[in-house]
């Protein structure tokens, strides 16, 4: 099944929304953990059960966030692949095709930053 450029751009835009929305809950979660740490309510002397809960919550939120982000990037790269097969594309289509390398970099950086944040949390607690 082949799609025209307009359909592919609509799919691209849907994936963009997913990439953004997939980060809302983890951002709120990390903000709450940071607020607890900054106010001294979450530190090395905090009850170990609460620390394990926070670590588990952040880890599971991170896994879901990374999974959603990588899936959206993969779907977006499929759109790029389909756009490249079209005989001609508009400036918008060309811009989307040009975004492919940045998406790959974004995916790699996102995984690294997520891992870094988790390691820092573990070290702090």
Question: Where on the chain are the PLM-derived regions?
Answer:
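Alpha-helical transmembrane segments
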Residues: 22-25, 49-63, 102-112
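Core segments of transmembrane alpha-helices
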Residues: 29-34, 108-115
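Short alpha-helical packing/oligomerization segments
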Residues: 42-82
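Charged, low-complexity, helix-prone segments enriched in Lys/Glu/Asp/Gln
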Residues: 14-29, 65-79, 99, 103
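Cytoplasmic juxtamembrane interface segments
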Residues: 35-55, 91-103
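Juxtamembrane boundary at the C-terminal end of a transmembrane helix
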Residues: 116-125
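Short membrane-interface loop/juxtamembrane segments of multi-pass integral membrane proteins
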Residues: 4, 8-15, 80-104
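Cytosol/matrix-facing amphipathic helices and coiled-coil assembly/linker segments
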Residues: 1-42
């Amino acid at each position: 099944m082949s799609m025209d450029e307009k359909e592919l751009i609509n799919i691209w835009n849907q994936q963009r929304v997913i990439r953004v929305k997939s980060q809302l809950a983890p951002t709120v979660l990390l903000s709450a953990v940071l607020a607890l740490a900054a106010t001294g309510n979450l530190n090395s002397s905090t009850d170990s059960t609460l620390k394990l809960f926070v670590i588990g919550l952040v880890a599971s939120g991170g896994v879901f966030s990374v999974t959603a982000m990588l899936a959206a990037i993969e779907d977006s790269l499929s759109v790029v692949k389909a756009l490249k097969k079209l005989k001609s594309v508009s400036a918008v289509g060309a811009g989307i095709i040009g975004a492919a390398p940045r998406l790959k970099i974004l995916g790699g950086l996102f995984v690294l930053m997520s891992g870094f944040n988790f390691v820092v949390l573990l070290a702090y607690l």
